[in-house]
Amino acid sequence: MDTFKRWLNKPKADDKSLLARFFHADRSLTAVASELDSFDGRAEPDRCTRLVSRLRQNQDKVLAITNLIMEELLGEDRDPRAFRAKFPEEVLQENLAGQLWFGAECLAAGSSIMNRETESKEMRPLAQAVTKSLGNVRVLLRDQCLKNNVPNSKTLHLDLNDSTTEQLYESLKIFDRLFAEFELSYVSAMVQVKSRHEYEMQQWIGVLFSETLQRALKIGLLDQEMVDAFDPGLMFSIPRLAIVAGLVVYAKGPLNMDMPGDQLSEMFRPFRTILIKIRDLLRNLNNQELYQLEKLLCTNEDINTKVPLGSSSIEAPSPEHSSHPTTSSSQNNNNSSNNNHSSSSTNTTSTTTTTAGTTNTHRTVERLVDQRNNNHNSNSNSSTNPTVEAATLRSPSMLSLSATSTPTASPAPSPTPSHSIASTSSAATSSTNPPADWSDGDDEDEDDDDIDVDEEDIESSDDGTDEEQLLKDIVSADCASGYLIPNTNLGNLLQPQEVPLTDNFVASEDDEYGTAEQQGHQGLEEDEPSTSAAMLAATRTLQRLRLPSSDNEPLAEPTTIKASEEHMQQPSGRHRDSHSHRHHQRHHHHHHHRHPHQHQHRQPHPHRTTRSGRKRCSLEAADPERIQPDREQNLASGDTSAASSLSDDVSLAMRNTTARLKFKSTENLLHRLFVCIAGVADQLQTNFASDLRQILRSVFLMNMSTAQEEIDIPEKTKESELFEFRASENDVIQESAGSNQSIYSAEEVNPELDNVFSAGGGNQATGQRHSAGASMQRNNTIDLASQPGEGSPSGATTATSRSHVTRSRSLGDQEAASSATSSTAQLRQLEQQQQQQQLQIQLQRQRNNSVGSNTPSSASSTSSSSEQNSPVSARSGSRRRLQSNNETQMPSSATSTSATLSPPAWIPDGKAPRCMACQTPFTAFRRRHHCRNCGGVFCGVCSNASAPLPKYGLTKAVRVCRDCYVREVRSGMGVQGVQSVQSVQASAS
């Protein structure tokens, strides 16, 4: 009996209820699956492929109907799917559910996703649970289809007291939860799904892009018109400028290269190494050079900078970036010495270059020290040196390079009476080491050859001075590298037990003269550097390195610095392999054939033990033992944090300065930066196109100017500009086939043939069309002759009032003026009735007028006054009256045509994805059509009717939908009957 009931309740094929649709879809899916299992797919691959395609289509249909059933039964109890916001746009497709089901069955059967073996193994238990739960749901739904189906019901009619209904409810909840978990896992394994941190970083990048655009608009790099017009060039300019701004201007933003790599956005994470190099080079640019680089990134114009490298101070802009490029005026003038002691080096240009470089290092550190002192002494006046004032306004990492640092500079006088000096590369190399290793960082085995390109050619010579003169020159200056350690006094600097601080820039006298055997080998063939080029500057710096709290402490009197005597008697077989200057090391490398035994016993840091005993800065005081505790106390003080801070700044200064020295000119540097920055930005366009489009779309919407609706009063146009060209339907179909744009109706093809352009009387059109942009203005003029008073003579000129009805029709906006209200329609109907009565009275008066009357009729009121007064007017009076009689035979039609309403606004194409009548989706071949009566969007089948619309001034047949056609035809028949009766009455009168 139960089987008979099931057979009786079996859904029919034309049943549209949810359960019936599921029953037939599931039955079709089962048939395809059975056929697919009935043969070997490898033997018949074509048939297998065809059946698999049908299988996936049926799976999509079954899951879609199941989803509708869950929406109705579960409602708010459905598992949330907010994670879909993380999915890319291309993933969210209509057949996503079918793909997930197919993937779950493949994983449950033991297959693995290609190149995702680990993820496949983790998802396999979940996939098996999904397929099992879905099979249970299908069985329960089929049972409900045979028991509780109501044919053609829009809702489900289940028995709530039945246990199977409750079981179905719980099974649907379990399946919904499992399917949501599998969807997240499967899509995350196939495509990259952003985390919460990544979304936050992407929002910060959007803010950076917006701030960059506003800054570019402020300094004149871009125009607001480009933003409003969505200029495609901005898609390339904004990311390039954002890289510069994120590295220099907003250095603590999302492009902060100091943060760990895993915290950077995935967009810039692959370019972290090159971005760090770009940042180091950008910090060497001044405001003018930075502006030229940004302009180059926007316009791709040639670089106008022809000045050599270092002609202006090189500084990175502070976060308060100047809105206009200004030439930096922080030129360092060295006024400490007037002596011109020309060195007798064989390479004068190289010597001068290295002299300037070392001097610049001292100047840089002086500025940093002055800044530190100014920060500690808030009540003290700022330094009188303009260079120091400029440095205090900037970040400590924003340093300056003097104008004399160009490799092509001419020989300049030495600022101090000094001998040939060491290269700045030693200081630059030591800057890459920790602050504690400033004195020994030059003895590493690895050499940065690409930085020190021409260092092998730098040699120095001695000017022949004796030992006493050398000692006089280096009094209190042989510890010159001590200025790298801030917040210290001479007691700290002269610590003999600590690592000596004289390796970076200055060589001691034992390096100059060495032992007797070393002098025998090198006496006349090698000249070694003896002193630094900025010893006096270092002496002044030492005075500023003391803490404010230590100013009252008794300062030990500096005396001459001499080497220890016991280390002057070193064995001859032990070479000075701890020399601080790299070019000196390379000098030994060039003479390696003379001393093959000297580099065999090289220690990792041998000078830590040898130089501390062989050479130290000693203080000739009365009681050295009494000063020792003071020095240890000072070293144990809490000044190490400030010392490391300033050491880091100096290290950054050395690295940036040396990096810039690789480039021959500013033009070369800017060109290299342009290539690197443009390369990174263009890679973003390729690798992260979707994210970049989304960010740029938000930036454009945030920064575009507010739209101001300007009402343009059209001027009188020429006859050739009266009409705009509009493409016909054939032109639109032939030229833009495949697009989803609307097809223009037949009325728009030849609008000049419409009667809406003719006036109420006369055979000449008085209405004019004015086009402004994409809109068209139609001015329809109605002449209303006021009824003269009873006492007025018959020949008196009647007063004419004009009522202008303007109708705006737009091709681009597809929006027109709002429809007239019902009160306005009633008022116009009364005006039409009054006008008909006036025309009848006027016709009667024209019949009573004499032939020679000069009073023109209302129909010929458009003629000029010269025509009325001419002799021809008398002879043509009868002809004019005949024309007026013919024109007044249909007064109602003329007035009804001219008194038109505004057409309804068209619904935009983007807001109508389906036909508003049959709900069929539009495609490239199923085009959109607008009804001219209601403004709705319909397909070609639902809008294949055409009818005239006199109320809108459209007397020719235009496209309308079926509903409007039935309504307009019925109303049109009634209006035409009334108009015919009125015309007959007018002709009879």
UniProtKB/Swiss-Prot annotation:
Tell me a Gene Ontology molecular-function term this record carries.
zinc ion binding
Which superkingdom is the protein from?
Eukaryota
Segments of this protein annotated with the region Disordered: 308-466, 544-647, 754-905
Q: Where does Zn(2+) 1 bind?
A: C915, C918, C939, C942
Which parts of the sequence carry Phosphoserine? S549, S550, S810
What are the BP-aspect GO terms?
A: negative regulation of epidermal growth factor receptor signaling pathway
Compositional bias annotation for Basic residues: 576-616
Give the Low complexity compositional bias ranges. Answer: 324-362, 374-385, 395-409, 417-436, 635-647, 816-874, 891-904
List the GO cellular component terms: early endosome membrane
Record field: compositional bias (Polar residues): 765-784, 794-811
- Similarity comment: Belongs to the lst-2 family.
Q: What is this protein called?
A: Lateral signaling target protein 2 homolog
Taxonomic lineage of this organism? Answer: Eukaryota, Metazoa, Ecdysozoa, Arthropoda, Hexapoda
